[in-house]
From Swiss-Prot:
Name this protein carries in UniProt: UDP-N-acetylenolpyruvoylglucosamine reductase
Natural source organism: Lactobacillus acidophilus (strain ATCC 700396 / NCK56 / N2 / NCFM)
Any one GO cellular component localisation term in the record: cytosol
Localization per record: Cytoplasm
PANTHER family documented for this protein: UDP-N-ACETYLENOLPYRUVOYLGLUCOSAMINE REDUCTASE
Entry keywords, A to Z: Cell cycle, Cell division, Cell shape, Cell wall biogenesis/degradation, Cytoplasm, FAD, Flavoprotein, NADP, Oxidoreductase, Peptidoglycan synthesis
Length: 298
């Protein structure tokens, strides 16, 4: 198989690997093939082989806001975490798709650049953060992104401006066109380094206080419906602390689903569907997932 030829060329490709090793929920079935490219050239070669041989292709970043079903994923899964270079040029920071949002935000801060403080505790990768326009504490990626470099499924390199990314709440054009984020450049403002770092430390302390970081979790599961907050609705509906299998709606922060031990992706999804059903019945509000759900049923 062509993929195995690339393996002989030195690209890190594995077979039948449990994706639960990589997801923040510690759940998920196997990847038929799993690759960890170290350069954009390796990404291009992998994409080309999948297109020429009609092999299904799935791109994953830090797997922090992701649920992979227990049946796993056919074809090739590419995890981009080996692409992690971060460069500072004046008031701009350029980070590879696999660089963590946290590392990028702190690199900016340590250079006295302001504009990514909100991202100090977001556990995802730059690629995933751009893909879903990640945000926290009143800030979103769209406010800092200047441009995004991508590789299309057809193997073409492109650069999108902020406007071309079509950002909105937890959305970007990448979700629609399937392009692969390779890097993003952030346009920031000079600031007081110590004040920036102090603010980031404060936000991280707030996060530790409010969020159930002691358990595996995919973070905030649901998008916020207009005019409502998910947590209070879940509490009033009597669902906080509800558990199915090893998956529990957190007693510390309603709307976060944690793995209390031995949870499967099916446990997670059953609990998500239960919460959606009860909230619809009680409030006539459709809760949509912020977390990305992929893979096959078991």
């Amino acid at each position: 198989m062509e993929l195995l030829n690339l393996k002989k060329q030195g690209i890190d490709i594995k077979e039948q690997i449990p994706l639960s090793r990589y997801t923040f929920t510690k759940t998920g079935g196997e990847a038929e093939y799993l690759a960890f490219p170290k350069t954009t050239d390796e990404v291009e070669k992998l994409v080309k082989v999948t297109q020429e041989n009609k092999i299904p292709l799935t791109i994953i970043g830090n797997a922090s806001n992701l649920i992979i079903r227990d049946g796993g994923i056919d074809g090739l899964v590419i995890i981009l975490t080996e692409l992690k270079n971060i460069e500072v040029n004046g008031n701009e920071v350029t980070a590879d798709a696999g660089a963590t949002i946290v590392d990028t935000a702190f690199t900016a801060a340590n250079h006295g650049l302001s504009g990514m403080e909100f991202a100090a505790g977001i556990p995802g990768s730059i690629g995933g953060g751009v893909f879903m326009n990640a945000g926290a504490y009143g800030g979103e990626m769209q406010e800092a992104v200047k441009s995004v470099n991508v590789l299309t499924r057809a193997g073409e390199y492109k650069t999108y401006s902020n406007q071309e990314m079509d950002f909105s709440y937890r959305h970007s054009i990448i979700q629609e066109n399937g392009d692969i984020v390779l890097s993003a450049t952030f346009s920031l403002k000079p600031g007081n380094k110590l004040q920036i770092l102090d603010h980031m430390d404060y936000l991280n302390a707030l996060r530790r206080y409010k969020q159930p970081l002691e358990y595996p979790s995919c973070g905030s599961v649901f998008k916020r419906p207009k005019g409502h907050f998910v947590g209070p609705m879940i509490i009033k509906a009597g669902l906080q602390g509800k558990q199915i299998g090893g998956a529990q709606d957190s007693t510390k922060h309603a709307g976060f689903i944690v793995n209390k031990g031995g949870a499967t992706a099916t446990d997670y999804l059953d609990l998500i569907h239960l919460i959606q059903k009860v909230i619809k019945e009680k409030y006539d509000i459709d809760l949509h997932t912020e977390v990305r759900i992929i893979g096959k049923e078991n």
